[in-house]
A protein has these predicted regions:
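Short Pro-Gly-centered flexible turn/kink motifs
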Residues: 2, 134-136, 254
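Beta-strand-rich N-terminal accessory domains
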Residues: 1-55
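Extended, loop-rich substrate-binding clefts of extracytoplasmic carbohydrate-active enzymes
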Residues: 55-119, 214-253
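Short, mixed charged/polar active-site loops
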Residues: 43-44, 96-98, 133
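Short polybasic amphipathic segments
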Residues: 30-39, 53-63, 86-88, 174-176
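A generic structural signal for short, non-catalytic loop/turn and secondary-structure boundary residues
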Residues: 28, 81-83, 92-94, 169-171, ...
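Polysaccharide-binding surfaces and accessory modules of carbohydrate-active proteins
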Residues: 101, 106-231
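Short linear motifs in intrinsically disordered
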Residues: 23-26, 74-81, 164-168
Length: 254
């Protein structure tokens, strides 16, 4: 088979069994979709395209930072299914639009080859229910898991080698291509991944790499970038004279 990824009733992507072996509990860090909206004359609103996390909240370390549990989410969601489609309606009284997700994998009767394409389509639909103009932007974030070998004590993925992210574009689709390097192509988790869209190039902004800092710097940088204007800067640039805090040092000195 081609493995599978599960879509939870909150709108969350979970159970990533795509590494040529069972992985019922596999989680993909920093992998989610977000929406930004701004009504004429109003304040910008941003949400992760999931409903709020559910209890019990009983893990000894709480949520790991790669789960971005502190980012704002929708009040509730409703899932309905009609094979091969899954539909999720997101609900929040503060949101001036109706938002839903239609997700499916290729299913073509009498065509086993194309029905087995290892990919999924996620179509987010937004309807303006007001009389005002509303600007909308949707962003997707997905971790490069090529070479996945398990998790460390803090739920971060371990990899067989290095990873590379590259923006690619052609006449049909454009997006981020995920590959690996410096390990054997015979490794059980060797391969590639992609996060792509059919949107026109002129409407796309991208951030192929997250900011490499300490603790939650990468997630905070992404969210501040996106929630400000609904667009992504290609790179994060910070001027920190006399300080290595945003690098990989454990201490900062002035």
């Amino acid at each position: 088979g081609t493995g599978n990824v599960s879509l939870g009733a909150r709108g969350n992507l979970t159970t990533w069994q795509i590494f040529n072996q069972p992985g019922q509990m596999n989680r993909m860090p920093y992998t989610f979709f977000s929406i930004w909206m701004k009504q004429d004359g109003g304040e910008a609103i941003s949400r992760v395209l999931e409903s709020k996390l559910n209890p019990p909240f009983n893990r000894s370390q709480g949520f790991f930072r790669n789960e971005v549990a502190g980012l704002p989410r929708f009040d509730s969601s409703v899932m309905t299914t009609k094979y091969p489609f899954v539909n999720i309606e997101f609900r929040d009284e503060e949101i001036p639009v109706q938002i839903s997700l239609e997700a499916y994998t290729p299913f073509i009767p009498l065509n086993a080859k194309d029905s087995g394409i290892p990919g999924a389509y996620l179509n987010y639909k937004v309807k303006n229910t007001t009389k005002e103009n509303i600007e909308i932007s949707i962003a997707g974030s997905m971790n490069n898991a090529v070479g996945f070998e398990g998790y460390n004590n803090f739920s971060f993925m371990k990899h067989a080698g290095d990873r590379e992210n590259e923006y690619r574009s052609d006449d049909v689709i454009r997006g981020i291509m995920y590959t690996g390097k410096n390990f054997s192509d015979k490794h059980i988790t060797w391969g590639n991944m992609a996060l792509s869209t059919t949107e026109k190039e002129e409407y796309i902004t991208k951030k192929p790499l997250w900011y490499q800092g300490q603790w939650t710097d990468g997630g905070e940088d992404f969210w501040q970038d996106f929630s400000t204007d609904g667009r992504l800067n290609n790179e994060s640039i910070y001027d920190q004279v006399g300080s290595n805090w945003a690098e990989k040092s454990d201490f900062s000195f002035l």
